[in-house]
């Protein structure tokens, strides 16, 4: 069945939610964990249910979105325990409300909240393009630095659209949560990830005026 998106968010009915849990918390999570281990690092696969890590609520009253959710809080104990023992936590973006109902949450939104919960200085969002463009068909129109105010204007005007909206909003939210640096880079280019991790210029960096 073809996925339906609304404002960049996946519409998630009951049946789709079951598939999301099986795939994100199962095959994808364990596949990434195994791949990291194969490269010589220690990793542990986790989901929002573990230790009550990701508390969620319904994203909106829009019935089309169904079980699409948003983060209400992060319990970081399990994450910090993993990090303090030398493990890279691989976390699926499924959260649960106080009644145990699962919600499909945009992974970028979860990443920003987790970054803030563990006091990260920098959060890096990866996609399949080099960052935010004034014109997606013109590579030279890449915006290297973007203020929160300007980003909001670009969303309102439709320059930033589709799946880029939640990524940009996640960057904005990360800054609001106290993270010093939020960047969108091309995850297919290792050199961009290395540069962003070192605090060098890559992709689109967001800042508050």
Per-segment meaning from a language model:
Residues 1-192, 208-209:
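Nucleotide/pyrophosphate-binding catalytic subdomain
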Residues 198-209:
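Active-site loop ensemble at the mouth of alpha/beta enzyme cores that anchors a bound cofactor
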């Amino acid at each position: 069945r073809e996925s339906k998106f609304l404002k960049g968010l996946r519409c998630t009915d009951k049946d789709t939610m079951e598939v999301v849990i099986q795939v994100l918390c199962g095959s994808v999570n364990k596949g990434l964990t195994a791949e990291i281990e194969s490269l010589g690092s220690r990793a542990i696969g986790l989901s929002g249910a573990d230790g009550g890590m990701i508390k969620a609520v319904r994203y909106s009253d829009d019935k089309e979105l169904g079980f699409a959710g948003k983060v209400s809080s992060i319990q970081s104990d399990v994450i910090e325990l993993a990090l303090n023992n030398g493990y890279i936590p691989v976390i699926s973006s499924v959260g649960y409300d106080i009644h145990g109902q699962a919600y499909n949450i945009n992974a970028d939104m979860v990443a920003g909240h987790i970054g803030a919960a563990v006091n990260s200085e920098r959060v890096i969002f990866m996609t399949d393009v080099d960052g935010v463009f004034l014109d997606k068909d013109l590579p030279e129109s890449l915006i290297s630095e973007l203020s929160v105010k300007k980003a909001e204007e670009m969303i309102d005007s439709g320059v930033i659209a589709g799946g880029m909206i939640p990524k940009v909003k996640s960057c904005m939210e990360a800054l609001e949560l106290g993270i010093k640096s939020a960047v969108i880079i091309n995850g297919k280019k290792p050199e961009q990830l290395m540069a962003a991790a070192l605090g060098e210029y890559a992709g689109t960096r967001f800042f508050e005026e």
